[in-house]
Amino acid sequence: MSTRTESNISESGLDEGLVLVLNCGSSSIKFALYDAAEHPLPKRPMWSGKAVDIGGPNVTYEDTDTPCGPLRTEDDGRRPYVAAIDYIRARVRKRVGQRRLIGVAHRVVHGGPKYSHPVRMDAEVLADLKSYIPLAPLHQPYALEAIAALMEGVPDLPQVACFDTSFHYTMPKVEKQLGLPHEVWDKGLRRYGFHGLSYEYMALSLPELYGDISKGKVIVAHLGSGASLCAMEDLKSQSTTMGFSVLDGLMMGTRPGTLDPGAILFLMESE
């Protein structure tokens, strides 16, 4: 499929083709294809898959139509992550067939203090998001690498970044402020909150399951290797356990959670 075909957008809008969703981690890429022509929009993808152990010796690939097996790409100097994105794009192209791929949506962990809603990607936005890499060094670089690779490979294909931090913009300022001098707020030090896309999905799903009672005061848990809690009222975030970084809050698989700064100072002085 040519670049022009991949990036074709119908004159009637973005509701007649397919949308690819990417969730890029440090060594894995999960992807799903949704039919934008379905109304209401489907909660389950028409096709999905993942590539795992990218950059490692045993990188594997699987999708709805393909059992798990080694992912083999040409050794042509491309970075492993870019090679994996190109491989997935080729598989998507084959799966799309005569349909139109009208856009790509990316999970991006950190939108910083600037981005409170999904945003169409361009060079300026990409530069902004790169500046937030220090705030999420284990997550942010890989989503941006995928975005940059697609910008280069299919420059006319619309890409949209959806942020894990956006859902928590509704928190009162008193919840966002840290116990530090006020001037650090202007430096971006504040409680951002994460797992927002997961919580947004729950906010959309709860009324279907429980009706109007779900619009009251509700505590929602995102539990996995990374974990957090979110307090909602009227289906909007009011408080969350994660703060400035994804290390805060609950104790997790490889993250300490809330930690007394005095403990760190003690270890620095005694070890």
Give each language-model segment a name.
Residues 167-270:
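Glycine-rich phosphate-binding loop of actin/hexokinase-like ATP-binding domains
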Residues 19-21, 28-78:
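Short glycine-rich, Thr/Ser-proximal phosphate-binding strand/loop in the N-terminal lobe
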Residues 6-9, 13-15, 142-152, 197-218:
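Conserved phosphate-binding catalytic cores of ATP/NTP-utilizing and phosphoryl-transfer enzymes
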Residues 26, 79-83, 120, 124, ...:
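Conserved active-site and cofactor/substrate-binding residues in soluble primary-metabolism enzymes
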Residues 55-102, 146-148:
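Conserved active-site "lid/cap" helical segment
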Residues 92-139, 158-160, 167-175:
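Short beta-strand-loop/turn "lid" adjacent to the catalytic site in phosphate-handling enzymes
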Residues 106, 137-140, 158-163, 219-221, ...:
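General beta-strand structural signal in soluble alpha/beta enzymes
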